[in-house]
């Protein structure tokens, strides 16, 4: 089986999730790190903003991450994927196989994230979109399919300054 390709924007989010995990000194990269990284993605941020205040979601995610046990500073380590993150990826790959797409993208991962059971990230995202998954996913797909609206998929400006840890 060929390796899974990621779109550039998803690769950026993936790397940012790992960075957030390392900055928090967490042993495992979790869906919550991914959700925090997704909030830095302009189109995702704007879509969330049409349902609720993204800063509320951001604060709830980082409250969870702050309460998560961290690796002591004197210990060297490499973060690994949590079981939930592995399940998220597995579900996303299955979804990709059904839709016959060439590269994994943000919309695939978000769809799988919303379906993830026993996940704080799934719960918080669902709560912030008022559990209107179908409407949220339609808006998210529209946002990512609208290339003319935002040629840059990530930003460090707008009102995203609160996102940096």
Predicted regions: what they are:
Residues 1-162:
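Histone-fold recognition with a strong bias for associated Lys/Arg-rich disordered tails
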């Amino acid at each position: 089986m060929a390796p899974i390709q990621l779109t550039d924007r998803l690769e950026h989010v993936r790397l940012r999730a790992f960075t957030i995990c390392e900055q928090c000194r967490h042993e495992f990269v979790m869906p919550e790190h991914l959700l925090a990284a997704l909030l830095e993605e302009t189109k995702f941020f704007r879509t969330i903003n049409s349902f609720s205040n993204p800063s509320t979601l951001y604060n709830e995610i980082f409250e969870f991450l702050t309460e998560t046990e961290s690796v002591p500073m004197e210990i060297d380590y490499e973060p690994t994927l949590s079981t939930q993150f592995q399940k998220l990826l597995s579900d996303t790959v299955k979804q990709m196989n059904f839709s016959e797409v060439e590269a994994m993208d943000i919309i695939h991962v978000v769809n799988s994230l919303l379906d993830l059971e026993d996940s704080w990230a799934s719960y918080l995202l669902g709560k912030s979109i008022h559990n209107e998954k179908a409407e949220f996913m339609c808006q998210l797909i529209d946002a990512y399919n609208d290339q003319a609206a935002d040629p840059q998929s990530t930003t460090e400006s707008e009102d995203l300054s609160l996102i940096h840890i």
